[in-house]
């Protein structure tokens, strides 16, 4: 699936050449896609319900302020126009929160999208081929933190499917997911060396990696666990672990307790396998 926003014409054309399922971000993209690359047989639209999503996180929790997706009325109108332009199979996509650590997020998202799907099919008569629940199921970056239970999450989605879609005669609709962070984030590591140690109002460990290699801490203030492979235990100190970019937010850790480190030590920054 090709999900994008503010998409250049040549990228829509390339997606069509690849045979990718295009996921339109905006109602206005219907006319744009028609001129840029033509309307494919299978197409999807991204939904934004507006309001505040109570199960959201600081990364994404306010759909009304998000630049992604279209309103319900826009999505319904888009489906009508796309059908008239030759589209035969349709999908619905939404991402309402990012990196949730809650077994409730996916089932609640599913419930909202399944109810939307029933209404959309009723008002447009389209053949709904799939619903893409996207991502949002995250990991706990704190080593001792609570984790998602994917079996419980899956059961919640299944219950919503049977109660809403199956009951409405839509039991053939496929469900897609995009659980990249959940599957991959724990299995990536950023390995870096301590190159400098500086003492002013704080103690700084300068390393040979930077926000160029891992942006989350600089962008979101996100926590990533750090291990000193040369000194995993022993006396500790409070440090900032920083890169060399000329930006004061180029920091992997702020006021973090780590074993006393020396120049040349190898640090491992954990859980970097996704959204780096």
What are these regions (language model features)?
Residues 28, 70-73, 77, 104, ...:
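Conserved active-site and cofactor/substrate-binding residues in soluble primary-metabolism enzymes
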């Amino acid at each position: 699936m090709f999900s994008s926003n503010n998409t250049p014409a040549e990228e829509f054309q390339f997606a069509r050449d690849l045979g990718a399922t295009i996921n339109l971000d905006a109602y206005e993209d219907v006319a744009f896609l028609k001129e840029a690359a033509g309307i494919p047989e299978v197409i999807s639209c991204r939904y934004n319900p507006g309001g505040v999503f109570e199960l959201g996180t600081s990364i994404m929790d306010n759909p009304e302020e998000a630049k992604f997706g279209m309103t319900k009325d826009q999505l319904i109108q888009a489906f009508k126009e796309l059908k008239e332009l030759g589209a035969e199979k349709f999908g619905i996509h939404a991402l309402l929160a990012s990196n949730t650590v809650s077994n409730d997020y996916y089932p609640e998202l599913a419930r909202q999208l399944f109810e939307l799907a029933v209404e959309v099919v009723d008002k447009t008569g389209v053949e709904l081929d799939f619903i893409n629940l996207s991502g949002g199921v995250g990991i706990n970056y704190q080593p001792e933190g609570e984790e998602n239970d994917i079996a419980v999450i899956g059961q919640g989605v299944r219950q919503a499917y049977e109660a809403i879609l199956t009951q409405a005669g839509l039991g053939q609709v496929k469900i897609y997911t995009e659980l990249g962070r959940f599957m991959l984030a724990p299995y990536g590591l950023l390995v870096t060396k301590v190159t400098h140690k500086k003492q002013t109002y704080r103690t700084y460990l300068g390393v040979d990696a930077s926000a160029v290699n891992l942006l989350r801490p600089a962008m979101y203030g996100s926590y990533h666990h750090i291990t000193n492979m040369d000194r995993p235990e022993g006396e500790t100190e409070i440090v900032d672990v920083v890169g060399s970019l000329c930006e004061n937010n180029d920091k992997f850790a702020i006021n973090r307790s780590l074993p006393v480190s020396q120049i040349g030590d190898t640090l491992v920054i954990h859980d970097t396998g996704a959204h780096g």
